[in-house]
Amino acid sequence: MGRSSKSVRLLAGVITLVAVLVAPTAVSGAAPSGPTGGSAAARWAASHDGPQPHAGVNVSWDVPIRMSDGTVLRANVYRPADARERPTSTKTPVIVNMTPYTKLVSSIGSAVTQHPVLEPFLLQLARSINLSGTPIDGINDIAHTIRDGGAKTFLVDFDLVRSGYTQVVVDVRGTGFSQGKWDVFQDREQRDTVEVIDWASKQRWSNGKVGMSGVSYSAINQIQAANKNPKALKAIFPVEPGGDLIRDIVAPGGALGVGFLPLWLTLVNTTKMIPNVASMLNGTFDWKWLADRIADPLTFYPQLLAGLFTPDIASVPPELKELLETDSEPRTAWLDRAENITTPTFIYGGWFDLFTNSEVRMYNKIPLPPGKKQLIMGDGYHLTIGGGQQGRAGSPPRLDVLQKAWFDKWLKGIDNGIDSYGPVNLKQVGDSWITARQFPRAGMERQRLYLSDRRSGTAPYAVRDGSLTPTAPQSRARMTVAPGLAPVCSRDAAQQMAGALAIFPGCSDDARISERAALTFTTPPLTTTRSVSGYSNVRLNTVLDATDGYWTATLNDVAPDGTSKVITSGQVVASLRGYDRATSQFAPNGDVIDPFYNLTLSTRQRVAPGRPVSIDIGLLPTEAIVKPGHRLRVDVFAMNFPRGLPLRPLLNESGLRPQHIQLDPNRPSFVNLPVSTPIG
């Protein structure tokens, strides 16, 4: 009896010891749950926000990095340090950020937003800003990028550095304090990025493992570096990356991106002229830098001006012509080639970002297993990184938290569960966040909804109020729409201007103003909830009075009170309607659902005035919920300024004449949608 009792006590002791030893491991290994990441995300946040092994940050300013052609780039190097800013002697992983916006901006922004006194004040200010219900309540989302961690992915994250990383911020060639001519993502600039990665891996403070971080431009060059698979590059965290710059922002659908390009080019070409004042004071001014700036003061402006002012096709200059041919050096350099990437990649994008066209394509092309590649798609704009939602209840963790967890996994080998997150987290337009295995989500059915001239009674203010029906109309009708400026107040305008116009929600959140220049086609109220997940296409049977025209279509969610919110949109210049069948996607019935436009002069197809021509308008991919009582609507416009403006020769050929949809039972006009349950 005594021996038995002793055995029981011994067994109980062993079980208790095992429980004590195993329990922390079990908790730390708990898999992330849903979009929020569950308890795993709480540990990621604690790892980022809690006490760090290093108290300070040591900065080396304007470190020279010589490229293989002799050009010198300049970098700021941020290293973990003690409280007196003495750098650690321990070798660390390195995070590289290549920026065209001058590292001066990054250093000032980081110093202000992460100052020990100013940071709490700014965070509290961001939390306290609430302009909801005012004409400028879109400012809320911009302010919340500080709270949501988006700002730290653009700037330098001092918490990340103090946790044991070195961050290197480099002015790309021809910008900031770096020598050379700004190459705008082309081959020489891409080679620079690879050489910087190699340089960073071999410094005395580096352990040889390199990651990359950054937003927008600094996300695109991450993708470009990763597709070359440099040996030292172990992980990337691109926020809002583009993968096909012609189709994303330069000329989506063949229309010049006038709402974004002039302002962006002016920003970079202006800031690259800011001299290194410190070098002027200490006698080390770089005269080669000055000579390079004088030689190339307005990079890419000749192409922009040619697109705006060249009167006809015969007069198109070489610098513009090369952008309008598939095999030209810029066009090939601007493709993501994500199918070559083997580096763990975490992509953050948005349904109303500048680069929505590319973000999900990129994720799907990367030949890595889910987990080693991750995708988050929010519903914010380019400037509202995180959309004011990250870190809130029901939403993914803050971006700075996710970024550190990603680097901890792939650069430090910490088994924190980030590779079990997602792999695809999607903000459903009109609803909440969901986690999926893929995008588009499985289980969608393709459905045609046909454009009809029968009045829906929901848009009396539109040019024409039509219906959207599950069966094709049996009568013929012609509906005419003329180019107009109402889309200046629209979600497309807000999207093209990176979200700057979204501070006025009356334009971005309700399409009824822009619909005054549109033909609208609306369903009856839905009786059950429908999901829309994937690519949609609007097929129009058109007639033009000129040899060219410009078509835009949007898919909208119309609430019972009449509010019309754009879910997704697309556009195409009529003569550039041709698409590459090998790259485009098709529905089982043969309908094109994702036309990959050629956008070249050599494949241009002028329209015969007065003759019907079928036009396919591919809409950007989306994930949306349409609730009972709401309606779906297709809007059709003949102009979409400032989202786009046809190249001047094509605009001149259009004459800005009215454009017609010819409704014909033999050549129906329709939208092909990916829906959870057929409508009607």
Q: Predicted regions: what is each one?
A:
Residues 204-216:
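Alpha/beta-hydrolase fold nucleophile elbow
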Residues 151-152, 162, 184-203:
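Alpha/beta-hydrolase active-site loop
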Residues 161-177:
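Conserved alpha/beta-hydrolase
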Residues 46-90, 526-528:
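N-terminal cap/lid segment of alpha/beta-hydrolase-fold proteins
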Residues 46-48, 100-162, 227-341:
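Accessory cap/linker subdomain of secreted extracellular hydrolases
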Residues 47, 392-680:
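C-terminal, loop-rich substrate-recognition/catalytic regions characterized by aromatic stacking residues
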Residues 2-31:
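Secretory targeting and sorting signals
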Residues 341, 347-349:
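Short beta-strand/loop motif that positions the catalytic acidic residue
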